């Protein structure tokens, strides 16, 4: 293991109609799968700022600014070893301000009920994150970290403490 990292971010929008996902077309990592409404790889100047990355991706892929989103928060961080690199995914959640319609440059956007979202074809870490969010995370405000293994992802709340 030589310590190669792949840092990625994704944003999911929730609302009365459920959760907004993107059927991504033409991606190097998650092609022809459902993912967050926008997301992608960190730029070098974003490596210490996941929010800067997700805001850039929202602008590039959706034409969306932070002022058009409510309660944008980092909710999940997952880690997975794949093809000799550590893949770190930062998942944000928020809601769109009323009346905002979106189009994506990266694929097809679809709203799904929470029940439908659990059955979507997604990359493995995103799938496990979504299952946890639907059963646990959407009912609280915790930040969760997860290690993805062959049989699932173990999620734990991340909390600040002295020491």
PLM feature segments, named:
Residues 65-75:
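A short coil-to-beta-strand element that immediately follows conserved catalytic motifs
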Residues 1-21, 41-43:
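Conserved N-terminal beta-strand and adjoining loop/helix that marks the start
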Residues 18-56, 153-163:
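Conserved Nudix-box catalytic region and its N-terminal flanking loop in Nudix hydrolases
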Residues 7, 33, 86-92, 110:
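Short beta-strand micro-motifs in enzyme catalytic cores
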Residues 102-132, 157-161:
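NUDIX/MutT-family hydrolases
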Residues 17, 77-100, 131-132, 136:
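Active-site-adjacent beta-strand/loop module that shapes the phosphate/pyrophosphate-binding cleft
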Residues 136-163:
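Charged phosphate-binding loop/patch that engages nucleotide di/tri-phosphates or the phosphate backbone
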Residues 13, 91-95, 111-113:
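Short, well-ordered beta-strand micro-motif
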């Amino acid at each position: 293991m030589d310590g190669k990292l792949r840092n990625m971010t994704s944003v999911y929008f929730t609302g009365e109609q459920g959760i907004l996902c993107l059927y991504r077309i033409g991606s190097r990592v998650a092609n022809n799968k459902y993912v967050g409404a926008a997301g992608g790889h960190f730029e070098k100047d974003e490596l210490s700022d996941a929010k800067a990355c997700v805001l850039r991706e929202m602008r590039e892929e959706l034409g969306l600014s932070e002022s058009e989103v409510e309660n944008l928060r980092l909710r999940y961080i997952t880690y997975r070893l794949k093809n000799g690199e550590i893949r770190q995914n930062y998942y944000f959640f928020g809601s769109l301000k009323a009346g905002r319609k979106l189009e994506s440059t990266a694929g097809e956007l679809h709203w799904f009920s929470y029940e439908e979202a659990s059955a979507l074809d997604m990359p493995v870490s995103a799938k496990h994150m979504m299952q946890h969010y639907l059963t646990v995370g959407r009912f609280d405000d915790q930040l969760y970290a997860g290690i993805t293994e062959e049989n699932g992802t173990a999620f734990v709340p991340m909390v600040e403490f002295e020491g």
